[in-house]
């Protein structure tokens, strides 16, 4: 039986862009990732899929990159030849992943090992958990409902394409839904359907396998884990964001220039995002908090630095659907170029409640790391003392409890 994952390209582009920096600049880094399901309840306990998950992981760890896949990676201008040579030898090691269950029938997953291994497991494991969970819930009615919703999205994108003013910056969306997809075949069907409906709007996908297969642009730069790692590397905690951005610049020399802003919140990020970074980076990515407030703060920051914000891009990727994306585009289009990464709403909108699952970096080199985020529910760490210290260092107040 073929595993759920049958290609090591079946992951998000930013795994490759981050891994390249890790390999070149801090290859000895050790990391710990922990799984969390944020759903209050599920149709059946996730513990029930443990045995199948173990088998899928065994299959995943037998995969290697093919010459064709390596050739595709070499064709991306920001991927360096020595990194592709490393990937030719690469194989995920099963011993770095522990799977267990607790007395509440919850699934426990820990990935602990070298960051150049541990970081690469995340998307694969989340996609496997999703597919195993929803496989047991699939009926013809579920697929029918998914198709009905997909066709409504395609029709809406056609309307938007017709309504766009050619003098405005374009409205562009990308698929960011690999980690929470229903299954790979459905993700491909969604992208093909929307591409056919509105080729001027659908910019690409974060999924490298599907970008290669469909001949569209792979999208992505960095994730929270990249910046968080610098909380435990050899820099003062106060300077970790600057060190991470500097490291990125050193690797990519102006390429892949979208910076993620919410590891310790937008206000703390902007204090570090000085004229040098603001000129060098093409734009910013929003992943938590009120997107309108966030974008207005970005605009004020560029104004203060006397940078024309119309030359910069705001990328939004937090819980979006087509309507929210279009509304944000209307609000910001006269001040910024915009881009929208839509995840679960594209790849797992089938009528069931989607799983809100994450596999987050919680330790690096034996030291706690954390994300404060602009949305309190997205804060994640295994060390509340470190979290309090991080708040103090970056002057981030405790979120108000309702």
From Swiss-Prot:
InterPro entries: N/Namide_PRibTrfase, NAPRTase_N, Nic_PRibTrfase, Nic_PRibTrfase-Fam, Nicotinate_pribotase-like_C. It catalyses: nicotinate + 5-phospho-alpha-D-ribose 1-diphosphate + ATP + H2O = nicotinate beta-D-ribonucleotide + ADP + phosphate + diphosphate. It is an enzyme of class 6 (ligase). GO terms for molecular function: nicotinate phosphoribosyltransferase activity. The keyword Phosphoprotein applies. Transiently phosphorylated on a His residue during the reaction cycle. Phosphorylation strongly increases the affinity for substrates and increases the rate of nicotinate D-ribonucleotide production. Dephosphorylation regenerates the low-affinity form of the enzyme, leading to product release. The modification Phosphohistidine is found at residue 224. GO terms for cellular component: cytosol. GO terms for biological process: NAD biosynthetic process via the salvage pathway. Pathway: Cofactor biosynthesis; NAD(+) biosynthesis; nicotinate D-ribonucleotide from nicotinate: step 1/1. Its EC number is 6.3.4.21. Keywords: Ligase, Phosphoprotein, Pyridine nucleotide biosynthesis. The keyword Transferase does not apply. Belongs to the NAPRTase family. Catalyzes the synthesis of beta-nicotinate D-ribonucleotide from nicotinate and 5-phospho-D-ribose 1-phosphate at the expense of ATP. This is Nicotinate phosphoribosyltransferase.
């Amino acid at each position: 039986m073929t595993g759920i994952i049958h290609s090591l390209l079946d992951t998000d582009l930013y795994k490759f862009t981050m891994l390249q920096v890790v390999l070149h600049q801090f290859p000895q880094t050790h990391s710990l990732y922990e799984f969390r399901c944020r759903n209050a309840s599920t149709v059946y306990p996730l513990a029930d899929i443990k045995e199948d998950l173990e088998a899928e992981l065994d299959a995943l760890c037998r995969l290697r990159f093919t010459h064709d896949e390596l050739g595709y990676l070499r064709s991306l201008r920001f991927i360096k030849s020595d990194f592709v040579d490393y990937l030719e030898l690469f194989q995920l090691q099963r011993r770095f992943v522990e799977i267990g269950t607790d007395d509440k029938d919850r699934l426990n997953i820990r990935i602990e090992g070298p960051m150049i291994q541990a970081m690469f497991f995340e998307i694969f494991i989340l996609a496997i958990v999703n597919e195993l969970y929803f496989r047991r819930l699939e009926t013809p009615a579920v697929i029918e409902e998914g198709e009905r919703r997909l066709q409504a999205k395609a029709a809406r994108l056609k309307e938007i394409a017709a309504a766009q003013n050619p003098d405005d910056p374009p409205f562009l969306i990308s698929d960011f839904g690999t980690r929470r997809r229903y299954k790979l075949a459905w993700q491909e069907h969604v992208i093909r359907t929307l591409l056919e409906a509105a080729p001027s709007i659908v910019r690409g996908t974060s999924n490298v396998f599907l970008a290669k297969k469909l001949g569209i642009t792979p999208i992505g730069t960095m994730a929270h884990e990249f910046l968080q790692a610098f909380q435990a590397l050899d820099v003062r905690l106060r300077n970790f964001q600057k060190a991470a951005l500097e490291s990125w610049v050193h690797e990519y020399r102006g390429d892949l220039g979208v910076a993620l802003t919410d590891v310790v919140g937008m206000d703390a990020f902007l204090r570090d995002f000085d004229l040098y970074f603001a000129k060098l980076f093409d734009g910013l990515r929003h992943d938590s908090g009120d997107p309108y407030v966030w974008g207005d703060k970005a605009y004020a920051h560029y104004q203060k630095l006397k940078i024309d914000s119309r030359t910069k891009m705001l990328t939004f990727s937090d819980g979006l659907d087509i309507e929210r994306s279009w509304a944000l585009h209307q609000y910001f289009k006269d001040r910024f170029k915009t881009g929208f990464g839509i995840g679960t709403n594209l790849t797992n909108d089938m009528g069931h409640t989607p799983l809100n699952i994450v596999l987050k970096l919680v330790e690096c080199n034996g030291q706690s790391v954390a994300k404060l985020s602009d949305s309190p529910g997205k804060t994640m760490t295994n060390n509340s003392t470190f979290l309090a210290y991080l708040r103090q260092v970056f002057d981030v107040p405790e979120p108000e409890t309702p």
